[in-house]
């Protein structure tokens, strides 16, 4: 190849890379918070989809009207939220229905009910399918994300509750709150092909790393978490929080209901409802090592992270700087009232369209 052609090719690659960086750097980063996201309590943000500007101190931007009302016209508690950059849509489940909204027009495209109700769902990376758990019952529905129609049903008899789609789109992780086993479904066949566990008790919130080799699970009765090897299906470790006692909790009946990996997978953050704290663990060692704790404004029941790993978002509405461990903001609505929710997702906009979406779960994103 002639030198000038080589240089020209390099220049094109560099310009392309710069353009991609500029598009990402110039993106408007917004946090979408679904309400009511603490049971059906309206005092923590009312009803709707609240939008906050991440780069402007998490300032309140707007409230988008949503559906999800019961027969008396009162808001049902939100169970999950998921969004797709591929389709520009956002989905909200309540105890009875799932609603699909167009993010650009902010219009409701459809709302559908499913036999057995709904719980915390997960969407495929291409935005085409959603795995929707029934409300603590025996099955998951696999749903066409464009139409809301049911494609098939997966029966686990586990008290279906929480769902994570693997980043590669090949596996979906299905946790029921009446089973000590984490079920894993193959997304090509929509069948459970393997499990991880058993863990010491029924699984509550959980997370997985990017390579899908490890899972970290909350279980009933434990102030702490357990670690599972996804490859072998075996439980590896049990980690109990040191220096704090278990006690009564406002919700969930579980000492630790919320766990997440920082995107770089260097840390694991764990909720502690009774003590109104987040406990931080070094996840570069096994088992993860407890390193510090952060006091929050209320009892946390969930935690996730910004895509860049700079902020942690416990359900209390505190915004925590991951590096300094300091609370740097608190979510507030248009009236100045404190906002809390266990259902939130980060969405990036550029050129009038959605270019990237986060996840309601604090999943690992470390590139291998």
Show where each model-derived region lies.
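Predominantly soluble domains enriched in secretory-pathway, periplasmic, or organellar proteins
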Residues: 18-368
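Bacterial N-terminal signal peptides
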Residues: 8-17
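Bacterial N-terminal signal peptides that target proteins for export
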Residues: 1-8
